[in-house]
């Protein structure tokens, strides 16, 4: 086997771009319908009242209101509390 790989060959180039995951709107923040609340892989946060879940597990607001984080049956959930 060759101990040198040859012209125009490299052993580098394997660093991928960041996925920009995480919480995008924090507790108490006012949001409008359609705003992204959490970008995630898997369901680290589950959708609660007024929150929908996309095909890539992104959580988004279904209605306008304030973001509320909490737990339900041991799971972290995100709710939207309508502003009265």
Swiss-Prot record:
Gene Ontology CC terms, in alphabetical order: cytosolic large ribosomal subunit
Note one Pfam family from the annotation. Ribosomal_L27
Question: Which portions of the sequence form the region Disordered?
Answer: 1-22
Bias regions of kind Polar residues — which residues?
7-19
- Cite the Gene3D superfamilies for this sequence: 2.40.50.100
PROSITE patterns in alphabetical order: RIBOSOMAL_L27
Q: Which PANTHER family match?
A: LARGE RIBOSOMAL SUBUNIT PROTEIN BL27M, RIBOSOMAL PROTEIN L27
Write the protein's name: Large ribosomal subunit protein bL27
Look up and give the organism this protein is from.
Answer: Streptomyces coelicolor (strain ATCC BAA-471 / A3(2) / M145)
